[in-house]
């Protein structure tokens, strides 16, 4: 079994924020692989699912914590303990400001790199869980980061956002059998990152 958790904030006003791209990824995964409706569980909204792999079906728990971004670990830890899973059975999808828009990287272990949601998960389950990092770009100055991540994606950003969310769902069978490197490569093959940040106008030659 795998827990696929997204980082985000639960209120409707945050729904389209860059900080909620983890929730968006889990929603895409649920549309593709979910087998039951969302319901309140584990201090969040949870949905059961199943993904087909060459090694047979793998059960899924899709999870959107309602604890707010910075306390996401409480929900993830509760679900992991309930199902008696290991941290390596958990993938947490989240926004990554230190990656260009539309990039996707899998990572296992390591520090939180200033991400309070990841720090919260680490405090509950240790640092061996897997992370699906979705690049949203950086506003250019650290004082602008909070306003930036709590801002909605611009219309032009959906040129890369919508395809990468679909790819994260479509390529999941590779992650379900533990091949995170192949999963990452397949997501980027299905949804290549833009060559330039679509938020910024192209410079004249």
Swiss-Prot record:
Catalyzed reactions: an N-acyl-L-alpha-aminoacyl-tRNA + H2O = an N-acyl-L-amino acid + a tRNA + H(+)
GO MF entry, a single one: tRNA binding
Pfam families reported for this sequence: Pept_tRNA_hydro
Compartmental location: Cytoplasm
GO BP terms, alphabetized: protein quality control for misfolded or incompletely synthesized proteins; rescue of stalled ribosome
Keyword Cytoplasm in record: yes
Oligomeric and partner information: Monomer.
Protein name in UniProt: Peptidyl-tRNA hydrolase
Annotated organism of origin: Caulobacter vibrioides (strain NA1000 / CB15N)
